[in-house]
Amino acid sequence: MKTLRLILGDQLNSKHSWFKEQSEEVIYCMFEMRQETDHVTHHIQKIIGFFAAMRDFSEQIKANNHKLIYFTLDDKNNKQDLAENLQFLIKEHKIKHFEYQLPDEYRLDQQLIKFCKSLEISSKTYDTEHFYTKRNDLKDFFKGKKQFLMESFYRDMRKKHDIL
């Protein structure tokens, strides 16, 4: 099944399980977008550093024989909008399945949830694998408890991960 996988600019993890195997059926995508540079004022050096890291990571992915589509800020196909870029690639490459890693930013999380609901193809989310905890660990830990003391959560995490 032809799959499109989105990599966001803060998910540059070459050790992610996605990259353990190469497949002709998987296409990765990354986008430099005005949507991300303009929603909050950023120093130009921060934006340049962010895009430089993304470009370097994209070269690593290609060097490891993964298919990747990368839209630079001035790419003629870049719609400057995440949903529009994804929709373009889904149509252009006859994608049957879409996957993405859970974003750390609420705004992007909501945008991707809405986008996936609008799709006529299947979709799936993955953990970013760069944190000790998963998205719902804190909520699950405190479920049914009357006291919400972070120290107890941290102690539990240290035991689980054998730290200290």
Language-model features: where?
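Beta-rich, aromatic/charged-enriched effector core domains that present basic-aromatic interfaces
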Residues: 83-164
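Acidic-and-aromatic substrate-binding clefts and catalytic sites of carbohydrate-active enzymes
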Residues: 74-80
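Short strand-loop junctions, especially beta-strand C-caps/beta-turns
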Residues: 73-74, 103
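Surface-exposed, flexible loop/turn segments at secondary-structure boundaries
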Residues: 13, 36, 76, 106, ...
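Well-ordered alpha-helical segments embedded in enzymatic catalytic cores
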Residues: 53-56, 81-85
